[in-house]
Amino acid sequence: MLKMNNLTLEKKAQTRNLRKTLQGIVIRTSPKTIMVEVETAYKHKLYAKRFKKRKKFNTHDEKNLAEVGDFVKIAECRPISKTKHFRLVEVLQKKGEI
């Protein structure tokens, strides 16, 4: 078994790819899982009309911190299950807060 010193671990951490992070609203909760709806704005290439697309992501929420209506930040991670490939990073804003 190979032992790694701190320098090689730091180098590995620096070369690791950045994970995709998204922000969205929680639309459904269940134990350790939330469904987050992410809205992105696009511009049509030919007609230059702006439009919005919405996509839903199943997200892992280990501590059950998020509730329906919360604005959250999620990050891409290894596959946790068949449909879960994101994890909850933080709750940016609770439902009742302004």
UniProtKB/Swiss-Prot annotation:
The keyword rRNA-binding applies. GO terms for cellular component: cytosolic small ribosomal subunit. GO terms for molecular function: rRNA binding; structural constituent of ribosome. Pfam families: Ribosomal_S17 (PF00366). One of its GO terms (biological process) is translation. InterPro entries: NA-bd_OB-fold, Ribosomal_uS17, Ribosomal_uS17_bact/chlr, Ribosomal_uS17_CS. CDD domains: Ribosomal_uS17. Keywords: Ribonucleoprotein, Ribosomal protein, RNA-binding, rRNA-binding. NCBIfam families: PRK05610.1, uS17_bact. Part of the 30S ribosomal subunit. Belongs to the universal ribosomal protein uS17 family. HAMAP family: Ribosomal_uS17_B. One of the primary rRNA binding proteins, it binds specifically to the 5'-end of 16S ribosomal RNA. This is Small ribosomal subunit protein uS17. It comes from Mesomycoplasma hyopneumoniae (strain 232) (Mycoplasma hyopneumoniae). The gene is rpsQ.
